[in-house]
């Protein structure tokens, strides 16, 4: 059968429109394109497109009227304020609203003159016509069906035009529109499926982060705050037009990947033992053993009293009253020293300050200064394990526990590399795994150097460190002022741990102020000399 040139041209035009629609990734713009293509194919003067929402209502997404110069929703800056149309009224299908009836019945409704169309309620259209002087006449309403034949939306076209005359929508136009609508519905469904899958994956990532935060009230919120700070830094670098990173620009796709990476950056901690994550004191295991040490010191205190008491009794028997007074002073001095030693151990157990060599030696001295009898065995008041834990230089974790914590990145690596990320999320693993790497290659889990890491991977380390330093929910330290946080980070830059260019932008753009105001105490923002903190070139 020979196809007429006009039909061939129409077919090719329809195909071209369909291709354009299939490439659109923004659902709002996609729906607008479907509507505008329908208006063009039918030569309609006006039209609206609706999407079925979760409340079982038809929600306006784009409204267009050529004669009135009206364009709402979609790419327009004008928002739609019209109320959604319920599909059901009193639990029964809404058959008075024509768009609802088309959705509920799955039927195409072609009306020559809406003023004569019963039983549909066109009172709103009449009222609007009276106010505007417009005349709503012919109308074509048809549902958009997905691959399972479910209704995903409705298109309503108003006033087919032939020159300046309003005519009816012909059967030929109706068939053309339905053919196109099927393609449009498929494109819309595909985009909705992709969007829903992405929402599901992002929600899953956030759920994992929430579960990890819930493991410890002392670090709770870390997995939530890091992604937000990461994006704040990324936006600052994107906008910064000076220095080595002046040409760095973050696409929407890369920004989305960085957001997902932020939520998943510590996912390996789900396998880290709770008592290690929760370790808020140096002697803590399942419980804080400082109470056990205190009990042993109480025994030592009792032993001092008993030993001196025995000496006093012996002196009294010999009538040496002067010696008794000396023994009383001896007991007083010994007990005072014991209380000082106890207070010292309680303080260093917190782990909030760097432990000096002198303090470490003091722990060993205290350990041998007092002996007690336990299980018929005479022993030092502190065990080797207790000495080792109390002697941790910084924080509360000993070497073995720190190794366990670091292994969370191995678990994170295994989890993320096992996930079959689609192309548009291909960089998530690389971004997420960068926050414990260092510029000199001495970090973990892969020991990468700066040149082997992308900018997003390197900036996540800045976010991770600043969040940890500025946090007020760590039990072993109070919230640090910004100046102290940045000074510590500046030293990390000097030691080739953090990226100097990213740190410079972080400081000069004052990202820390925005973050502190949102997630911490504004009182932490203090005065300091920015130039003294910035790395020297």
Predicted segments — roles?
Residues 94-100, 107-108, 112-138, 160-170, ...:
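Signal-transducing coupling segments at domain and membrane junctions
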């Amino acid at each position: 059968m020979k196809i007429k040139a006009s039909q061939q041209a129409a077919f090719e035009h329809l195909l071209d429109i369909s291709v354009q629609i299939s490439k659109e990734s923004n659902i709002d713009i996609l729906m607008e394109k479907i509507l505008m293509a329908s208006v063009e194919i039918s030569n309609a003067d006006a039209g609206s497109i609706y999407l079925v929402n979760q409340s079982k209502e038809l929600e306006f997404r784009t409204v267009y009227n050529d004669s009135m110069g009206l364009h709402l929703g979609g790419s327009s800056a004008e928002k739609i304020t019209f109320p959604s149309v319920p599909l059901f009224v009193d639990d029964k299908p809404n058959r008075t609203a024509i768009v609802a009836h088309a959705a509920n019945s799955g039927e195409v409704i072609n009306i020559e003159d809406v003023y004569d169309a019963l039983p549909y309620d066109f009172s709103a259209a009449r009222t609007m016509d009276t106010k505007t002087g417009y005349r709503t006449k012919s109308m074509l309403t048809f549902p958009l069906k997905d691959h399972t034949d479910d209704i995903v939306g409705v298109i309503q076209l108003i006033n087919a035009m032939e020159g300046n005359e309003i005519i009816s929508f012909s059967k030929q136009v109706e068939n053309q529109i339905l053919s196109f609508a099927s393609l449009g519905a498929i494109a819309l469904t595909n985009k909705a499926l992709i969007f829903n899958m992405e929402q599901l994956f992002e929600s899953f990532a956030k759920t994992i982060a929430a579960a990890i935060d819930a493991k410890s009230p002392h670090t709770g919120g870390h997995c939530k705050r890091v992604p937000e700070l990461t994006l704040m830094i990324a936006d600052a670098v994107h906008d910064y037009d000076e220095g080595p990173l002046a040409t760095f620009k973050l696409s929407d796709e890369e920004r989305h990947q960085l957001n997902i990476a932020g939520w998943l950056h510590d996912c390996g901690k789900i396998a880290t033992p709770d008592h290690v994550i929760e370790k808020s004191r140096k002697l803590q295991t399942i419980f804080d053993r400082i109470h056990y040490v205190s009990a042993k010191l109480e025994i030592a205190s009792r032993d001092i009293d008993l030993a001196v008491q025995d000496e006093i009794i012996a002196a009294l028997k010999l009538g040496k009253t002067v010696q008794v007074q000396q023994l009383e002073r001896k007991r007083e001095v010994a007990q005072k020293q014991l209380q000082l030693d106890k207070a010292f151990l309680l303080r260093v157990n917190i782990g909030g300050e760097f432990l000096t060599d002198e303090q470490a030696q003091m722990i060993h001295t205290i350990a041998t200064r007092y002996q007690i009898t336990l299980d018929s065995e005479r022993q030092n008041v502190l065990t080797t394990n207790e000495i080792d834990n109390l002697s941790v230089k910084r924080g509360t974790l000993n070497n073995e526990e720190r190794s366990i914590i670091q292994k969370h990145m191995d678990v994170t690596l295994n989890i993320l590399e096992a996930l079959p990320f689609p192309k548009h999320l291909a960089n998530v693993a690389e971004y997420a795994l960068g926050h414990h790497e260092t510029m000199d290659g001495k970090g973990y889990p892969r020991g990468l150097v700066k040149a082997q890491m992308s900018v997003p991977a390197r900036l996540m380390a800045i976010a991770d460190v600043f969040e940890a330093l500025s946090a007020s929910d760590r039990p072993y330290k109070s919230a640090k002022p910004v100046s102290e946080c940045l000074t510590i980070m500046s030293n990390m830059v000097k030691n080739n741990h953090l990226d100097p260019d990213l740190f410079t932008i972080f400081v000069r753009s004052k990202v820390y102020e925005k973050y502190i105001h949102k997630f911490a105490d504004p009182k932490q923002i203090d005065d300091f000399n920015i130039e003294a903190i910035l790395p020297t070139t």
